[in-house]
Amino acid sequence: MSETHFGFEKVDEAEKADKVAGVFHSVASKYDVMNDLMSGGMHRLWKMFTIAQAGVRPGHKVLDIAGGTGDLAKAFAKQAGPTGEVWLTDINESMLRVGRDRLLNKGIVTPVCLCDAERIPFPDNHFDLVTVAFGLRNMTHKDAALAEMRRVVKPGGKVMVLEFSKVWKPLEKAYDVYSFKVLPWLGERVAGDAPSYRYLAESIRMHPDQASLVRLMEHAGLENVEYFNLTAGVVALHVGRKY
């Protein structure tokens, strides 16, 4: 069986899927609180930028992959309106349940689907937009997932990847201290789970940098790929198009 990385640890591919699932089953109930604490609320601005770049209009069909607690799906559902179609999907049942309930509590009724991004259960050329926010780095076969995202996007549509990336070099040392000391400490104090947040830091370091992700998206068949560095490269938004 092939090996892959779970953070810095080398594991079998099947084992990684189980370990990642365990992380998100553990953090689901505290996910939103921890996002605010870990990013100082910046994740809301990163998502607002993504929503603005997406340009969703009434009637659009949108697929939100690894949609978690539904921040993007909530905004897209409002923009697409009753004539649109916005799917909230996640591979993790606990995260999907939290996201579904959160949307319902906001009065937003939109379809949800337990979905593996490497095997998307939708037809070719169906969506105007596919988004994945802070989910790609957890996928074992990123190339296969990106190819699937391209497959289900209509010609003229976009695939958008919002993900942690390579921080500006002068900030690397401070960012390492924050990632490997502060994040696990916060995880232990707030969620009672330091290991999951240690994995978060490690998974960020193992994720392709900005230029490497451009190449990965191009290899998947996406064109005119560009990226926007946010907060000195802590996060980057990559946008690829299908023609």
Curated annotation (Swiss-Prot):
Classification via PROSITE patterns: SAM_MT_UBIE, UBIE_1, UBIE_2
Keywords: Menaquinone biosynthesis, Methyltransferase, S-adenosyl-L-methionine, Transferase, Ubiquinone biosynthesis
A Pfam family of this chain: Ubie_methyltran
Disulfide-bond pairs as recorded: none
Cited InterPro entries: SAM-dependent_MTases_sf (IPR029063), UbiE/COQ5_MeTrFase (IPR004033), UbiE/COQ5_MeTrFase_CS (IPR023576)
Catalytic function, reaction form: a 2-demethylmenaquinol + S-adenosyl-L-methionine = a menaquinol + S-adenosyl-L-homocysteine + H(+); a 2-methoxy-6-(all-trans-polyprenyl)benzene-1,4-diol + S-adenosyl-L-methionine = a 5-methoxy-2-methyl-3-(all-trans-polyprenyl)benzene-1,4-diol + S-adenosyl-L-homocysteine + H(+)
GO biological process: aerobic respiration; menaquinone biosynthetic process; methylation
The keyword Transport is assigned to this record: no
Pathway: Quinol/quinone metabolism; menaquinone biosynthesis; menaquinol from 1,4-dihydroxy-2-naphthoate: step 2/2; Cofactor biosynthesis; ubiquinone biosynthesis
NCBIfam families reported in the protein's UniProt record: MenG_MenH_UbiE (TIGR01934), PRK00216.1-1 (NF001240)
HAMAP family: MenG_UbiE_methyltr
Sequence similarity: Belongs to the class I-like SAM-binding methyltransferase superfamily. MenG/UbiE family.
Protein name per Swiss-Prot or TrEMBL: Ubiquinone/menaquinone biosynthesis C-methyltransferase UbiE
Organism: Cupriavidus necator (strain ATCC 17699 / DSM 428 / KCTC 22496 / NCIMB 10442 / H16 / Stanier 337) (Ralstonia eutropha)
Gene field: ubiE
